Amino acid sequence: MERMLLKKLYALDDIQVGIFEVESKIQYYIAVLIDGLNFEVWGKGKTPYEAIINASEKWSNSFGGFNPFREALRLRW
């Protein structure tokens, strides 16, 4: 398992979103805190912006409506 460093953590509409950086390579993961202890990965990319875009697309395809990842983009993470 690769070591992941939490870079930012947001609370968006009761959803906690973390931006992680993988130490061994230039890769960022966007993850949602699902049970108060564990994160579920929703997007990844070579930049935080790319990871947020991928997570936003997954959210839109799954739920629609309010998109916390678009809000993160608006806030410029």
From Swiss-Prot:
Superkingdom classification of source: Viruses
Protein name (record): Uncharacterized protein ORF77
Organism in which the protein naturally occurs: Acidianus filamentous virus 1 (isolate United States/Yellowstone)
